[in-house]
Amino acid sequence: MKTILSNGITRRSLLKTTATAAMFAAVKTAFPSGAFAATAGPEVTGVKLGYIALTDSAALIIAKEKGLFEKHGLPDVEVTKQASWGATRDNLVLGGAANGIDGAHILSPMPYLMHTGKVTQNNVPVPMAILARLNCDGQAISVAKEYAGTGVQLDASKLKAAFEKKKADGGDVKVAMTFPGGTHDLWLRYWLAAGGIDPDKDVSTIVVPPPQMVANMKVGNMDAFCVGEPWNEQLVNQGVGFTAASTGELWKGHPEKALGLRADWVEKNPNAAKALMMAVMEAQMWCESTDNKDEMAAIVGKRQWFNVPVKDIIGRLKGDINYGNGRVVHGTDLSMKFWANGASYPFKSHDVWFMAENVRWGKLAPDTDIKALVNEVNREDIWRAAAADLGVAAADIPATTSRGKETFFDGKVFDPENPSAYLDSLSIRAAS
């Protein structure tokens, strides 16, 4: 805090000013990059947010539909559909004041890739902040029906021979994800690599917006894809392909989407940022309740939001998965989590994994200071402040910013304290 003293200042006022400065310095330490006024209301009445038609955007939609933004002093929040993750990025670069958006339902790695300028025009960094995780689990890897005979599920190696034959016959094997370096890209790459298929050498990776996945597979534009719901369920319902694996089978309880905002908006509006989080957290609690699943599916499926039939949303939302290959499970714990088991809290350890995987695939430099980067972007302090004001039970507030070591379906273990050891254990990765 900068303090300007006049020449006529008294010793008493100097001591008082010094004490005040010390107090604000302490607040600055407690809440890096912005402090929260204890009783002040939001600095603004609204914020422009974007979303993609994916079930994991539900908290933003429910907060709008149920008046939760208004409840917390933000009656003018706008929640607008984005055509693709690329459009989300471009509108975040513009910012709300320039007819873009201030924040968004976003793939968890994207704020980091924007913050470092890796995915922005001319590589110009756009400082970003992650305030919360919007969900865990609830994505899937689906495959064209022509590969049903391979019996592929978690073990992607069953596709290896079929892919090699297609290439030998002059075909191109295409696998689709939604944004380079995003969660779907990373799940697809991890799954393929664990099965001995190099995603950079053995297949062609293409980018397709989530709502366009089913239509593109229907006309044979790709052999496999990774995307969130409801698009995998819709694929199966239309008989176009089948789900090989839910992403929760790759990494149970994995982090997925985030609530990301431009850092300048958060810095300028710390109380509004906290109020926004309070509304979103309440919506996440509502979405988590089993009693609300039918209503939730009906709301998000409406024309103004997803424009998707409820039947394409509700099954997997409730944990009932028809994989489309003869495998059907009911009441599985692989369903999307919005609040339970710390789903809303943005664990820094999870962001360390996302950054490590982006190093693995060459999106970030090997010498990236991952811990420093995560500390710049991850604003879990805002989540905690919002939780305190909401009266969230202590049991629902993580004691630390790390969930500890994580184990994947292939036996690999990720220690957030030593991402280099994890990377060294992986046999398939981009050339350094």
Task: Give the label of every model feature segment.
Residues 56, 65, 88, 184-187, ...:
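Stable alpha-helical elements in mature extracytoplasmic
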Residues 38-200, 204-207, 219-233, 240-253, ...:
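Short, glycine-/small- and polar/acidic-enriched structural segments
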Residues 269-381:
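Secondary-structure end/capping motifs
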Residues 1-13, 20-22, 27-28, 36:
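N-terminal secretory signal peptides
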Residues 101-103, 203-243, 262, 294, ...:
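Ligand-binding pocket segment of bilobal, Venus flytrap-like solute-binding proteins
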Residues 352-432:
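Conserved C-terminal helix/tail region of periplasmic/extracytoplasmic solute-binding proteins
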Residues 141-142, 258-261, 265-266:
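Short glycine- and hydrophobic/aromatic-rich loop-to-beta-strand nucleating segment
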